[in-house]
């Protein structure tokens, strides 16, 4: 697996360890920047999920997490497979699996997608020289998340 070998190679190059969380870094500057995360966490009141380990400094993000992960309210039901969704827009997007509809067309080639985010990823990875995906360990950049 390319990703696993990449991670192992990158971890071998890391010699400095954060004494608060155990994360490893290749140079002191990266460790210093990382330690700011721990300082910011201590300065802010953390909102913790009562069902799992999730925590955040923002109440709104906790509310979104609770709805997305722990809510059992799925009022919009797919008539084809019975899967439930919280919002009508999620059901509409899901229905494209059953209908085969792909309304999003690439402006550079024949690629079509049922989802706008998949089209954006396609354009970035196939039609640009951008390298938007960065490895957290070695900081190299890649055009596709599968390469990280």
Curated annotation (Swiss-Prot):
<comment type="similarity">
    <text>Belongs to the krueppel C2H2-type zinc-finger protein family. ZFX/ZFY subfamily.</text>
</comment>
<keyword id="KW-0539">Nucleus</keyword>
<dbReference type="GO" id="GO:0008270">
    <property type="term" value="F:zinc ion binding"/>
</dbReference>
<keyword id="KW-0677">Repeat</keyword>
<protein>
    <recommendedName>
        <fullName>Zinc finger Y-chromosomal protein</fullName>
    </recommendedName>
</protein>
<keyword id="KW-0805">Transcription regulation</keyword>
<feature type="zinc finger region" description="C2H2-type 1">
    <location>
        <begin position="16"/>
        <end position="38"/>
    </location>
</feature>
<dbReference type="InterPro" id="IPR050527">
    <property type="entry name" value="Snail/Krueppel_Znf"/>
</dbReference>
<comment type="function">
    <text>Probable transcriptional activator. Binds to the consensus sequence 5'-AGGCCY-3'.</text>
</comment>
<dbReference type="Pfam" id="PF00096">
    <property type="entry name" value="zf-C2H2"/>
</dbReference>
<keyword id="KW-0238">DNA-binding</keyword>
<keyword id="KW-0010">Activator</keyword>
<dbReference type="Pfam" id="PF13909">
    <property type="entry name" value="zf-H2C2_5"/>
</dbReference>
<dbReference type="GO" id="GO:0005634">
    <property type="term" value="C:nucleus"/>
</dbReference>
<keyword id="KW-0863">Zinc-finger</keyword>
<dbReference type="InterPro" id="IPR036236">
    <property type="entry name" value="Znf_C2H2_sf"/>
</dbReference>
<dbReference type="GO" id="GO:0003677">
    <property type="term" value="F:DNA binding"/>
</dbReference>
<dbReference type="InterPro" id="IPR013087">
    <property type="entry name" value="Znf_C2H2_type"/>
</dbReference>
<keyword id="KW-0862">Zinc</keyword>
<keyword id="KW-0479">Metal-binding</keyword>
<feature type="zinc finger region" description="C2H2-type 2">
    <location>
        <begin position="76"/>
        <end position="98"/>
    </location>
</feature>
<keyword id="KW-0804">Transcription</keyword>
